[in-house]
């Protein structure tokens, strides 16, 4: 049994587990402008709320904790919409559980990671986003069912490949 547990720990040894949530309210998405941390891979970009798993957390546990930490509000309902696999260069990777959610009513707290603001779906398209985020946001707004998306970036942040459900490269269509 000890050998099996050791093997299980190594399966994601080269990858990071995260959640990302797009909060919906009155036809708008809650976006976080990552502009407060010096060392931030997302610096200057607008993204949803979320973050890294802590030890022992399920995707939902991570979702609830991260959303509350960043907004000060609790999740009322949520839906797991997809899993996104990110590959950067040859070795670095992360796996993201992508959610949409509705939050309790109340004022948003000040976030230590950046500025929170609601935008219409059309306004979001004009924001500085990662190219891969544009792809999965489009899938979310179209109401696609559950999906798997693989995004490959080079070291400079250029999107090289976007594979939907293991089949279709969205960059070549």
Model-derived features: where do they sit?
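A conserved beta-turn-beta hairpin within the catalytic core of GNAT-like acetyltransferases
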Residues: 39-44, 93-95
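Unchanged
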Residues: 53-76, 86-140, 161-173
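Short, positively charged and aromatic/hydrophobic N-terminal segments
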Residues: 3-4
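Short, active-site-adjacent segments that bind or coordinate small-molecule cofactors and metal centers
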Residues: 140-162
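Short, solvent-exposed loop/turn elements at beta->coil junctions and helix N-caps
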Residues: 9, 81-88
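Short, surface-exposed acidic-centric catalytic microdomains
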Residues: 43-49, 58
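Conserved N-terminal beta-strand and adjoining loop/helix that marks the start
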Residues: 8-31
């Amino acid at each position: 049994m000890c050998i099996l547990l050791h093997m299980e720990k190594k399966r994601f040894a080269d990858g990071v587990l995260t959640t990302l949530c797009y909060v919906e309210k009155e036809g708008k998405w809650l976006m976080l402008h990552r502009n407060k941390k010096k060392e931030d891979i997302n610096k200057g970009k607008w993204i949803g709320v979320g973050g890294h798993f802590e030890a022992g957390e399920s995707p939902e546990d991570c979702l609830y904790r991260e959303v509350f930490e960043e907004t000060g509000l609790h999740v009322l309902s949520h839906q797991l919409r997809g899993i996104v696999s990110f590959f950067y260069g040859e070795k670095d990777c992360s796996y993201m559980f992508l959610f949409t959610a509705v939050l309790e009513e109340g004022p948003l707290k000040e976030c230590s990671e950046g500025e929170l603001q609601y935008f219409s779906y059309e306004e979001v398209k004009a924001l500085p986003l990662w190219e891969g985020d544009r792809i999965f946001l489009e899938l979310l707004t179209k109401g696609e069912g559950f999906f798997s998306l693989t995004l490959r970036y080079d070291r400079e942040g250029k999107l090289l490949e976007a594979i939907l459900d293991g089949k279709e490269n969205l960059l070549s269509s």
